[in-house]
């Protein structure tokens, strides 16, 4: 089955690579229209997936990621339309010039070819990834989690209908609808057909892909994100940022999971934090230095376990640790961070600059929420993933991250001397 999908995707990629920006945008507009026109079939399929997931005891965080509503589906369709408005990087000349030999040389952006994406209970990823791949002239093979099997099948069917109505092969966007995990291992060895693989899931999936894939892998998306409250932070303003970073949508990878508090501000900051977290329904996991003071406040508090500093809660839980100074905070982030998104709240610009320079994450913030690490917020459109590695792409992966380049030399029967 996968062999045939690979062949179909590779053949489709050749046709997609020849499309103009106008033609690709027409396809995307058609997909957005069809997602709205056929929303009932997608929502019905999603309702079945959600019911099964509830019966199987899926966590609240995962259920939130899985569930579609009419508003969410409309938002997904609108995101596709936003991709239409983005500049097409394909065909862009990055640099070039004329050599001494007279050869005119240029480096031009081109599609990667076929993208493989493995993800969990995130039905929006199906459309986000498909739209970005099509905009950049790439075919895509999707493997969603078993929890989204019906939703993905219904969504991809709508996308394929739109493709065919525009004269393009259905092989441009395909989904593996068999939940057998053995197919993941088979997909990881499809280097004959797939040019880049993007896993979007937990640490186990990323480890599996790194160890077994014969395809170049872009890893990331695991967000053990930190906010360091420096001793010069403005408490009231800092709390607004922390509430946003923790509670706006706790199930996302850019949600803060650990709060590092400078010891010199702890006595005034912790009571205010407890009051605010109680109002926000957040459970605090406190270290020994913060535990007694936080237990005296209104928030729900438990003693932090050492392994929780490495956890991506994806829920209304927040670690709180007292640190001696900026060096201590940076050391903690280096040990427990996932190089996703980390922030400092401070009025000391020297400390801010040190934090930016010394915290080696894909996104580092000064006096701002970690929730900004998002393709839409960065002006990149819907993102295919957030990369926490350093080669090829880093941070939210927009259109350029789905391209490579080729060197093109144009001569007049020019030969090398």
Swiss-Prot record:
Pathway(s): Amino-acid biosynthesis; L-proline biosynthesis; L-glutamate 5-semialdehyde from L-glutamate: step 2/2
Highest taxon, organism lineage: Bacteria
Main subcellular location: cytoplasm
Record GO terms (molecular function): glutamate-5-semialdehyde dehydrogenase activity; NADP binding
Catalytic reaction equation(s): L-glutamate 5-semialdehyde + phosphate + NADP(+) = L-glutamyl 5-phosphate + NADPH + H(+)
Family annotation (Gene3D superfamilies): Aldehyde Dehydrogenase, Chain A, domain 1, Aldehyde Dehydrogenase, Chain A, domain 2
Keywords in alphabetical order: Amino-acid biosynthesis, Cytoplasm, NADP, Oxidoreductase, Proline biosynthesis
Pfam families with a match to the protein in the record: Aldedh
Enzyme class: oxidoreductase
Record function comment: Catalyzes the NADPH-dependent reduction of L-glutamate 5-phosphate into L-glutamate 5-semialdehyde and phosphate. The product spontaneously undergoes cyclization to form 1-pyrroline-5-carboxylate.
Protein name: Gamma-glutamyl phosphate reductase
Species annotation: Escherichia coli O6:K15:H31 (strain 536 / UPEC)
